[in-house]
């Protein structure tokens, strides 16, 4: 059963397989399943509160949000904007951990009000009115317009992130310079349809499906194993792309330095090389970083190298 169809009753009616891996999102499908297919061994890959005692295999949202928050904070942001999660259990979990990790980082989470929840609470629609809300935020911060902002927006999934990007583009809001956008799922179909590549948490959906198949086999082998347990599947990594490729700093010196470090850290540069490239003193560079960024120039160089090494090790 799919979250993209009105219901999946016809699929279930003709289903003659031994078991089922499903994402329950439609109330008609849930009602039919609970009446007609309740004895069919099934693994649910969602968190819908349907009242059926099914084993579940779902994304580890705590680790998803750890990756998301670390990435946004590493870009220099001290606040994250998002929308209300509504009653969607998956989004509620992500929002809860978003708040928890931002609090640990001494950051803030702000909720934008102009989003609409579908009756099933499975989809959250980004409204054009969100631009007006961003304009009000800019005015409250004594800025000329939205393009003077430097904020990060977290979307609960890539579909929502794509909606946000299209809305921002429609109103000529700069991405990522004014609004950086981060999604979840690393959905290549969504990303290839965007003219700005989307940074996203790769939830390893293929691995989740494999784990769900293993759990289904356990239920098929021993029906007593079906006791409503929830198995969490860790995300693979965060995939940085253009939509967050910026640094939230109120200093052209620091911004230029960070971009140059990002382009040259692998060549053996030192903090003194950064200062020389920018034609400023080392003391001036250190002072600018101290006032406007979370790391010193030397720490940033070492950090970029550490991340690069970690990525290489992951690929070997």
Outline where the language-model segments fall.
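Terminal helix-turn-helix DNA-binding modules in bacterial transcription factors
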Residues: 291-316
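Bacterial carbohydrate/catabolite-sensing allosteric modules
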Residues: 1-22, 29-271, 275-277, 282, ...
């Amino acid at each position: 059963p799919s979250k993209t169809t009105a219901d999946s009753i016809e699929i279930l009616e003709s289903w003659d397989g031994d078991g089922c891996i499903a994402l329950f999102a439609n109330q008609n499908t849930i009602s039919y399943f609970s009446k007609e297919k309740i004895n069919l061994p099934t693994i649910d890959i969602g968190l819908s509160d349907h009242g059926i005692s099914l084993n579940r295999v779902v994304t580890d949202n705590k680790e998803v949000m750890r990756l998301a928050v670390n990435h946004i904070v590493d870009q220099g942001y001290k606040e994250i904007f998002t929308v209300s999660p509504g009653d969607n259990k998956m989004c509620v979990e992500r929002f809860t951990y978003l708040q928890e990790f931002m609090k640990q980082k001494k950051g803030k989470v702000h909720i934008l009000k102009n989003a609409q929840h579908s009756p099933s609470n499975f989809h959250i629609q980004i409204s054009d009115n969100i631009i007006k809300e961003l304009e009000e935020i800019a005015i409250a911060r004594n800025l000329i317009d939205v393009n003077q902002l430097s904020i990060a927006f977290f979307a609960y999934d890539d579909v929502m992130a794509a909606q946000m990007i299209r809305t921002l583009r429609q109103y000529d809001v700069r991405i990522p310079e004014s609004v950086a956008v981060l999604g979840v799922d690393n959905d290549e179909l969504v990303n290839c349809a965007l003219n700005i590549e989307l940074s996203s948490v790769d939830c390893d959906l293929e691995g989740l499906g494999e784990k769900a198949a293993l759990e289904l086999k356990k239920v098929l082998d021993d029906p007593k194993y079906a006791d409503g347990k929830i198995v969490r599947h860790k995300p693979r990594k965060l995939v940085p792309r253009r939509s967050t490729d910026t640094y939230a700093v109120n200093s052209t010196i620091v911004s230029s330095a960070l971009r140059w470090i990002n382009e040259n850290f692998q060549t053996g540069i030192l903090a003194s090389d950064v200062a020389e490239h920018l034609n400023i003193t080392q003391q001036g560079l250190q002072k600018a970083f101290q006032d406007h960024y979370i790391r010193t120039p030397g720490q940033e160089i070492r950090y970029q190298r550490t991340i690069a090494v970690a990525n290489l090790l992951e690929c070997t």
